[in-house]
């Protein structure tokens, strides 16, 4: 019985299946953790959702910002962008079933036995684990309710960017969503910066990657995250694992086997078209 953690799939179905074959993943015996952003950019978002849903209890995933955006498109709130390649999914006969399943997935996974925490973008250093759990449940409850379109319409925006327990209503939900699914950089006090996307060596002072600021969760747990492909899985402190290595951009799909901390990679079937800045089929 092994635990396999895989970075952002982004609709790269063929690479996902090849990677699972490579590690000899056995449903029903092994457990698969996925860092979110299952969909968008790659050609197989529909196939990815169908497959992951079929795995049932042997998969543990978290929602990413692209998954939430898909739900907003599905709800008629956001525009379906051609570059996301979501039309086959949105027009599939089982789209309602798949997307109603997706919106009931969590923002946070915790394994107390392994002392392991997973969230798409990471865990803000302003939170302890109980706060993170409570905040995740706040958003999950709204997403799984009939009023989820109202939340999806209000989730876009960069403010507020500083946590306080006194936050309420949509402002609270927006901060939580940004912290779990969009965060990269923080100010030294843990306040989120939602604008900078540079690599850490080029980030303007005084910004630091969220994982470079000590926090209660990172001091007691290992943290697995995705979201930040330009890190290429490098530069994180001990116990912090960034697994998004840009498969949809022509990079790799990366897997970490938890028990022995061994990495496996599956090269993308796509290459970067430097003229367009987009990955195309190889």
UniProtKB/Swiss-Prot annotation:
GO molecular function: bis(5'-nucleosyl)-tetraphosphatase (symmetrical) activity
Gene3D superfamilies: 3.60.21.10
EC identifiers of the protein: 3.6.1.41
Lipid metabolism in keyword set: no
Classification via SUPFAM superfamilies: Metallo-dependent phosphatases
Reaction it catalyzes: P(1),P(4)-bis(5'-adenosyl) tetraphosphate + H2O = 2 ADP + 2 H(+)
Record keyword Hydrolase present: yes
Pfam family, one: Metallophos
Domain of life: Bacteria
Record's keyword terms, sorted: Hydrolase
InterPro entries: ApaH (IPR004617), Calcineurin-like_PHP_ApaH (IPR004843), Metallo-depent_PP-like (IPR029052)
HAMAP family listed in its UniProt record: ApaH
UniProt family annotation: Belongs to the Ap4A hydrolase family.
Known function: Hydrolyzes diadenosine 5',5'''-P1,P4-tetraphosphate to yield ADP.
Protein name, entry field: Bis(5'-nucleosyl)-tetraphosphatase, symmetrical
The species this protein was found in: Citrobacter koseri (strain ATCC BAA-895 / CDC 4225-83 / SGSC4696)
